[in-house]
Amino acid sequence: MAGMAPEGSQFDAKNYDSKMQELLSQGETEEFFTSYDEVHESFDDMGLQENLLRGIYAYGFEKPSAIQQRGIVPFCKGLDVIQQAQSGTGKTATFCSGILQQLDYGLVECQALVLAPTRELAQQIEKVMRALGDYLGVKVHACVGGTSVREDQRILASGVHVVVGTPGRVFDIVRRQSLRPDNIKMFVLDEADEMLSRGFKDQIYDIFQLLPGKIQVGVFSATMPPEALEITRKFMNKPVRILVKRDELTLEGIKQFYVNVEKEEWKLDTLCDLYETLAITQSVIFVNTRRKVDWLTDKMRGRDHTVSATHGDMDQNTRDIIMREFRSGSSRVLITTDLLARGIDVQQVSLVINYDLPTQPENYQHRIGRSGRFGRKGVAINFVTREDERMLFDIQKFYNVVIEELPANVADLL
């Protein structure tokens, strides 16, 4: 069960929590971090290897995003780093670049371990790592649940430079000694807030206990709740913090609108009207339950709209096929839930529709960060019933943004 310490764990949650609470209550949080403000406005100014630069440009990056301008170099210097930035700003490429710069490619042993909260996100990181490291000959493998342990063991035995995975599977393969931690010199927690909210704290702690004493740690997160700050105290040595303040989390480059739909029953007609009005390359529609994913998919197909759908009740193989079709563009509309929001990284997504507003303001950025990725323009449209008005207000307050009513000329925005 997630959140339970695995068998043989030395983790004492009660003691750990009380110790962390004591540290946090001492008001020393600010002194624990040093900030890093050096800015590099071009990838060429970062001192990166030529073949890494080739991979970065081939992937489609032209100019580093705000987090990349400040975050790649300290990671390349071997510093422990805490980096907070919204989804869609290139956090993944930040730590991938830092790892790829520091690997010893002559040593085909695991030198970097990256943990992510979901299979989809782990597999996405694997793809980015492989693409950026294409000219370096990097060997990377994703170890995730729902796949063959034997296949993991075979690939790891043949030698890899980087392992990306979910906490449960990674702990399992380290415990089985299929992944030898002796040469691991970099440890990254991606979407740390999400991993902690899913109850992975114990497993993260247990994995860390098995790693070499001298190791570089990177914590990357869209939000930084108290539990994430706690874990940084436990694992990190004089970390530098690169923080995008909440008033900067404005999801720059994404135009955000709402549509007043009054009643739940009116949403479907509103959605179909939008699709008839707009020329959409690719879009993601978010709803709040798995059952609603299935319901909306049936309704849209019944009205002759081609849509695909994915949610947590589907087996991994089916989800992979659907995501592959969506990435390739053979399917242009994807209906899904928050569960998979962070694993969707499709460059062409120009529109996100919140058919249901998220139940937590924090999830809003994970959803709409799917559009306008890496500086491309994107549009987010929120369907708002009378019951949703409070949540819309909370979202605007949380991100310090004004979400305006959808204008009549919406077709010109896409």
Curated annotation (Swiss-Prot):
Any keyword Magnesium?
A: no
GO MF, one annotated term: RNA helicase activity
Could you give one GO CC term from the UniProt record? cytoplasmic stress granule
What residue intervals hold the motif Q motif? 41-69
Spell out where the chain crosses the membrane.
none
Keyword list (alphabetical) reads: ATP-binding, Helicase, Hydrolase, Initiation factor, Nucleotide-binding, Protein biosynthesis, RNA-binding
What is catalysed by this protein?
ATP + H2O = ADP + phosphate + H(+)
Q: State the source organism's domain of life.
A: Eukaryota
Q: Where is the Helicase ATP-binding domain?
A: 72-242
Task: Say which enzyme class the record assigns.
Answer: hydrolase
Q: Which InterPro entries match?
A: DEAD/DEAH_box_helicase_dom, Helicase_ATP-bd, Helicase_C-like, P-loop_NTPase, RNA-helicase_DEAD-box_CS, RNA_helicase_DEAD_Q_motif
| GO BP, one annotated term | cytoplasmic translational initiation
EC no. given is 3.6.4.13
* Pfam families (alphabetical): DEAD (PF00270), Helicase_C (PF00271)
- For the motif DEAD box, what are the positions? 190-193
Span of domain Helicase C-terminal: 253-414
For binding ATP, which residues are annotated in this chain's numbering?
Answer: 85-92
What does the protein in this record do?
ATP-dependent RNA helicase which is a subunit of the eIF4F complex involved in cap recognition and is required for mRNA binding to ribosome. In the current model of translation initiation, eIF4A unwinds RNA secondary structures in the 5'-UTR of mRNAs which is necessary to allow efficient binding of the small ribosomal subunit, and subsequent scanning for the initiator codon.
The UniProt family comment states: Belongs to the DEAD box helicase family. eIF4A subfamily.
Assembly information from the UniProt record:
eIF4F is a multi-subunit complex, the composition of which varies with external and internal environmental conditions. It is composed of at least EIF4A, EIF4E and EIF4G.
Q: Can you name this protein?
A: Eukaryotic initiation factor 4A
User: Which species is listed as the source?
Assistant: Triticum aestivum
